[in-house]
């Protein structure tokens, strides 16, 4: 490498800005950040820099949207030395993907602003259906701290969201919940008729009754998804603790939940093993309003502590996407690589080939899942869509739309498995800031293929003519020379 950078300038045909491009391999590389909390060779966690937990998900127009408790809001309130007590969390994080490894961060739903009556907002569960108006309606249920359940609605998975009730849907001490001290952690599903069902519950049972608490409840929702069409019915979930979720398949309701931290000394069944400590348990029923119909299928997802990682609480969601079945969950992956030890969680995804009758025991992994298909660079992509990054954060553009923003010199983002096909010689980007963005391929320390010079306070569209045609599949890095450079969007232009 030489100390000097020689480059040619190509006039931007859109707005007159210049793209600075390397020539004769004589470039000066910026110092690349090592502050990467998600490794470049592991697909977990989902977000490389946002603490979030208790995942749920829904598919819309071929894209998977997931939502979770915004642990990062707590982290920002208490800092590295603080503990995650969840008391400052009043929002829900949103991310999405169409390949299961590159995830776009969409910001958060400001629950406190939409529903100012809340105490906190944790552990969402979402479903959607096409209704009589021909539109898809989304219903997002969430824990109002440990004292109830609220619900938001929208006509798009990113909102805008509204609070149709203006109050909790479920609250402590409402009739029928005498044996449910903490009616939170909702799990929602739809049956084949589009009827909604909701499970929930939590709280500590008497010490003498940890095995059969009957604390969790299930209820059939009204046609509006905002009321009830049955009594609250108990589910006899062994060693129940929290984290209810519901799925429906082939006429069978699948109820999953987190077991507690208690000893299993009083387990008295021989047909199925006792579930592990704070593992996920599973029950099924074809007639969910009959308490006797629920059958315990066993523990199916180990605690992270039994998977060679730090112990933490447990919350999962089963989901099928593009013909493959996954389990969404959380661990402490990011925390393990940072200064904090306060219990700040991160959402993850692993394979779980479940059916309505079989639930293979699996565990959390660092490796995660594989890319379902290469990323298409000839479609516009948000700068906030990535596999991992270092020293990056976000700037909101509009509801559900973010730009990625550098926090320091040498910050970078990494997009995995980008298929340029027969080739491109031009990129179109929308960016702002003072400095340069470098385009690198396959290695964050590689020499830049293109260097885009920025000197603008507002977002500008920039056409970047590359000195070398890019063909085939590559991992793409955008490196940032200084703080406060924002990349909103990028796209390759197909070579004719």
PLM segments and residue spans:
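Carbohydrate-active catalytic/glycan-binding domains of CAZyme proteins
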Residues: 2-496
């Amino acid at each position: 490498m030489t100390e000097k950078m020689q480059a040619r300038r190509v006039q931007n045909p859109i707005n007159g800005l210049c793209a600075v491009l390397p020539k004769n391999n004589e470039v000066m590389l910026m110092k690349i950040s090592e502050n990467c909390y998600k490794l470049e060779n592991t697909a977990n966690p989902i977000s490389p820099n946002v603490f979030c937990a208790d995942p749920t998900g829904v598919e819309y127009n071929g894209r998977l949207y997931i939502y979770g408790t915004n642990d990062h809001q707590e982290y920002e309130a208490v800092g590295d030395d603080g503990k995650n007590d969840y008391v400052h969390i009043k929002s829900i994080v949103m991310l999405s993907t169409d390949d299961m490894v590159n995830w776009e961060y969409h910001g958060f739903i400001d629950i406190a602003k939409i529903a100012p009556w809340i105490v906190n907002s944790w552990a969402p569960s979402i479903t959607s259906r096409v209704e009589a108006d021909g539109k898809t309606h989304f219903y997002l249920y969430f824990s109002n701290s440990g004292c109830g359940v609220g619900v938001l609605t929208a006509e798009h998975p990113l909102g805008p969201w509204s609070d149709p009730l203006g109050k909790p849907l479920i609250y402590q001490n409402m009739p029928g919940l005498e044996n449910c001290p903490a009616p939170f952690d909702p799990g929602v599903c739809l049956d084949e008729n589009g009827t909604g069902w909701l499970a929930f519950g939590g709280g500590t049972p008497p010490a003498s009754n940890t095995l059969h608490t009957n604390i969790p409840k299930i209820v059939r929702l009204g046609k509006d998804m905002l009321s009830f069409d049955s009594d609250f019915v108990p589910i006899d979930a062994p060693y129940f603790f929290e984290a209810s979720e519901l799925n429906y398949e082939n006429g069978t309701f699948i109820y999953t939940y987190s077991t507690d931290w208690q000893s299993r000394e009083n387990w008295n069944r021989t047909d199925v093993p006792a579930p592990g400590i704070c593992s996920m348990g599973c029950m099924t029923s074809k007639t969910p309003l009959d308490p006797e119909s629920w059958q315990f299928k066993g523990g199916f997802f180990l605690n992270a502590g039994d998977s060679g990682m730090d112990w933490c609480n447990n919350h999962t969601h089963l989901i099928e996407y593009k013909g493959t079945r996954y389990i969404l969950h959380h661990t402490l992956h990011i925390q393990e690589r940072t200064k904090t030890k306060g219990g700040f969680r991160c959402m993850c995804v692993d394979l779980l080939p479940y059916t309505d009758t079989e639930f293979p025991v699996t565990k959390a992994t660092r490796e995660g899942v594989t890319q379902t298909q290469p990323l298409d660079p000839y479609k516009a992509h948000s700068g906030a869509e990535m596999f991992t990054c270092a020293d990056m954060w976000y700037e909101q553009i509009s509801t559900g739309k973010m730009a990625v923003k550098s926090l320091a010199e040498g910050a970078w983002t990494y997009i995995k498995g980008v298929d340029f096909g027969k080739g491109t010689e031009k990129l179109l980007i929308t960016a702002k800031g003072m400095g340069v963005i470098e385009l690198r391929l396959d290695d964050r320390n590689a020499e830049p293929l293109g260097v885009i010079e920025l000197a603008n306070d507002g977002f500008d569209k920039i056409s970047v003519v590359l000195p070398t045609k890019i063909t085939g599949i590559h991992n793409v890095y955008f490196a940032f020379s200084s703080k406060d450079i924002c990349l909103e969007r990028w796209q390759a232009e197909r070579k004719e």
